[in-house]
Amino acid sequence: MSILQLVLIALMQGITEWLPISSSAHVMLVSDVVGLAGRDELLINAASNAGTLLAMLLYFRKDVAAAIAGGFELLGAPVTRKPLSAGGRLALCILVATPFALAGAVIYENFIPENIWTALRSVYAVAASTIVFGALLWWADARGGQSRSEGDMTLRDAFLIGASQLVAVIIPGTSRSGITMTAARALGYERVEAARFSMLIGAPILAAVSLYGLLGLATTPADGMGASLTDGLIVAALAFVSGYASIGLLMALLRKMSFLPFVLYRFALGIALLATSPIVAGAMG
């Protein structure tokens, strides 16, 4: 694989995974350059997702450690009957929110008719969802208060935020990060807390995607594989660095301003997708 392909894939994954700007839309913009198939796709996707996941785990290492300790606390809760600590509540909220994205993936792969599946992945549908859900983020951010923080997360809120991921899985262009941050802002959570919880509940999903890719490598014939292990390591490293930087940038911006810059970016991205669509490009040509 060329260096350009590796860099584009890594940066696209690392930057777009955690920002509320839709990775599906970006994939469409550069699909001709980064097009992958077979074992190449499995290896590179697993590597890029793993790198991005490690970036989030490192950035939120204190929260992750608290959630892991809280998970063990949950296992003993029926016996001890003690009130849960902050880490225990966080682990429980993540546990409640996570299954929806996995369920959505099963629904998308097995129960969506092929004609609808094709329509949802068209450039027009992705462009429309990029714009529409950008507007929804704008609305939620404008109406949502700033009164609720980390300690205010309830199981009901975790359920609602987690359930919003179903939309992102089924409708490409929605953005999993974007829709969960939208839901959290609509529920009144501070912008930084909305982003933090969105990323924490994304960790199990990225882990599952990476594992799926690795399992696929073990069962897919090796013939014709162009990507090497070195390519995978390069992608993972670049995705890690760009992912860590994008998380830091997002959190810094949200401490000072609203989600409006990301909303405007989504509008521009949706318009760019429409402008590069076959019909529009043909008409302009």
From Swiss-Prot:
Gene Ontology biological process terms, A to Z: cell wall organization; peptidoglycan biosynthetic process; regulation of cell shape; response to antibiotic
UniProt key word Iron-sulfur: no
Record-level GO cellular component terms: plasma membrane
GO terms assigned for molecular function: undecaprenyl-diphosphatase activity
Cross-referenced InterPro entries: UppP (IPR003824)
E.C. designation(s): 3.6.1.27
Disulfide bonds: none
Catalytic activity: di-trans,octa-cis-undecaprenyl diphosphate + H2O = di-trans,octa-cis-undecaprenyl phosphate + phosphate + H(+)
Subcellular location, record wording: Cell inner membrane
Enzyme class: hydrolase
Keywords linked to the UniProt accession: Antibiotic resistance, Cell inner membrane, Cell membrane, Cell shape, Cell wall biogenesis/degradation, Hydrolase, Membrane, Peptidoglycan synthesis, Transmembrane, Transmembrane helix
Transmembrane spans: 40-60, 92-112, 122-142, 159-179, 197-217, 233-253, 259-279
Membrane topology: Multi-pass membrane protein
Other notes: Bacitracin is thought to be involved in the inhibition of peptidoglycan synthesis by sequestering undecaprenyl diphosphate, thereby reducing the pool of lipid carrier available.
Family of the protein in this entry: Belongs to the UppP family.
Role of this protein: Catalyzes the dephosphorylation of undecaprenyl diphosphate (UPP). Confers resistance to bacitracin.
Record-given protein name: Undecaprenyl-diphosphatase
Organism encoding this protein: Hyphomonas neptunium (strain ATCC 15444)
Origin organism lineage: Bacteria, Pseudomonadati, Pseudomonadota, Alphaproteobacteria, Hyphomonadales
